[in-house]
Amino acid sequence: MSTVVVVGTQWGDEGKGKITDYLAESAEVVARYQGGNNAGHTIIFDGNKYKLHLIPSGIFYSDKTCVIGNGMVIDPKALVKELEYIHSFGFSTSNLKISDRAHVILPYHIKLDGVEEDSRGANKIGTTRKGIGPAYMDKAARIGIRIADLLDRDEFARKLERNLAEKNMLLEKLYNTTGFELKEILDEYLALAEIIRPYVTDTSVVLNDSIDSGNRVLFEGAQGVLLDIDQGTYPYVTSSNPIAGGVTIGSGVGPTKIHQVIGVAKAYTTRVGDGPFLTELNDATGDHIREVGFEYGTTTGRPRRVGWFDSVVVRHARRVSGITGLAITKLDTLSGIETLRICTAYKYNGEIIESFPANLNLLAKCEPVYEELPGWTEDITGIRNLNDLPENARHYIERITQLTGIPMSIFSVGPDREQTVVVRGIYG
């Protein structure tokens, strides 16, 4: 029995899709447990690049069961579009299972997400405007509509009518914009429900039965620890729990069944959206890393903010997610930079801070404490063994493991599968 969770240790976009896709080859089940179509993951499969937002990375393996767990919020239109996208390349999706307890994103969630963000003015939180936050708000307020409701025509109609009365009032009276017609949404989403219906089941049964049978199960997190609603840079966060603990809530699998947590980190740091970012590079080096690493959002296309590796951030991720192994991606992007920096701590009013502050005003006043390391000029994209790395590259990632306190499990020197190097066994 072996279960592995893959989490991002930074602000998302760490390369989790690549690592998950690699590890999925040895798993029988791949599951997502939180988020929605607000985060994308890019997968290279058989030399081709695919971009997914909702469906787990393992979908391209016909012999793997792929699960969309109860902790996710699902936009049925986006889901059907993604199914059609996968089918267009000749892949089957018969191996997909969708939780009947997952919540549904509806048109009013998406519209409210946009108008609420616009109303914040200079205090925008950087939402992707996909309706994620409003859907999770309804879930917490106990007025959400779940997949099980969507498949029950009468129940869906009843709950939709109730919710539209409130949502239309908000849109029309508070935000001075138009609301929605009940019949229009009802007809469209009942049709979508019939497309989704064959995939829907109690996924907690699927997952627990698989684990109890001794199968390898891989849980795929979206976003990253610093975007976690509890442990991240609140309020500049997502509306769910990407940390490893989110697996138990978002999949219906108990904590005693989680065995390994792999934390994925870029060899530097990136962030999309607003909020403090102490190691950010607003200079030629930052521009160079952005272009070489092609640091643009999968979902939004927005240029990502780029900075040096921050060990304070990753130590925080290790602590709150119980990370047992580190996967460092995009090491090759740093080739050719003469001097590299790693943030080892923060300084506030002359005091050294080694843990990540919750107070963002305090965080914004901190200064990063850097350690400089020599870079390397060699092309490392063909490296397939840790000991074959240039001395400076090897020393760089060894220093990262020392500062974060996480043993190295994987490093990556390019986008392709064969450019993923396993240093330490994952599944045991």
Curated annotation (Swiss-Prot):
Binding site for GTP: 12-18, 40-42, 304, 330-332, 412-414
Subcellular location: Cytoplasm
Highest taxon listed in the record's lineage: Bacteria
Catalytic residues, chain numbering: D13, H41
Gene3D superfamilies: Adenylosuccinate Synthetase, subunit A, domain 1, Adenylosuccinate Synthetase, subunit A, domain 2, Adenylosuccinate Synthetase, subunit A, domain 3
Single GO MF annotation: adenylosuccinate synthase activity
Pathway, per record: Purine metabolism; AMP biosynthesis via de novo pathway; AMP from IMP: step 1/2
InterPro entries on file: Adenylosuccin_syn_GTP-bd, Adenylosuccin_syn_Lys_AS, Adenylosuccinate_synth_dom1, Adenylosuccinate_synth_dom2, Adenylosuccinate_synth_dom3, Adenylosuccinate_synthetase, P-loop_NTPase
NCBIfam families referenced in this protein's UniProt entry, alphabetically: PRK01117.1 (NF002223), purA (TIGR00184)
Protein name (record): Adenylosuccinate synthetase
Originating species: Brevibacillus brevis (strain 47 / JCM 6285 / NBRC 100599)
Gene symbol of the encoding locus: purA
